Amino acid sequence: MESTALQQAFDTCQNNKAAWLQRKNELAAAEQEYLRLLSGEGRNVSRLDELRNIIEVRKWQVNQAAGRYIRSHEAVQHISIRDRLNDFMQQHGTALAAALAPELMGYSELTAIARNCAIQRATDALREALLSWLAKGEKINYSAQDSDILTTIGFRPDVASVDDSREKFTPAQNMIFSRKSAQLASRQSV
């Protein structure tokens, strides 16, 4: 059974993916109309200018929507990992601490700097053990609790979303595009 947080993150991820795909479709439609007008006789210059502005805003909207989708995809994976590690520690935390006792013994009495060093050495030991296990080539599967959700969203976000989110905008550019986007939305709702 999934946690409420995981289910909410999954729903957000799916909604963000749908919004990103919708923005891509809107951009494609504007670009098609622009090309159709550009290749036609008796070009409507004002409509071409308007479409150039719409395309510019749509590209920004696609970029922003792709970024939201990618971040929400990462959130689903992060919540799943956190939940499963919490479950693991509930069941096996004592055994893990015992295995790492040479590094962690007396942890609560250590100074902050010494605690950080102890945790770092314990983390290094865990990393080494995990790398050794991975080197055996064992098959890795999603946990049974989260398998449906993780399989649905996929191992990584869609490659196209990564490409769509590559361009970075300054805060000033984001403000300008946000304003243009609101103006475009108000014109289209009339």
From Swiss-Prot:
Keywords: Late protein. The keyword Magnesium does not apply. It holds the Pfam family Psu. GO terms for biological process: symbiont-mediated activation of host transcription. InterPro entries: Phage_P4_Psu (IPR010006). Late protein which functions to suppress polarity of amber mutations in the late genes of the P2 helper phage. This is Polarity suppression protein. The gene is psu.
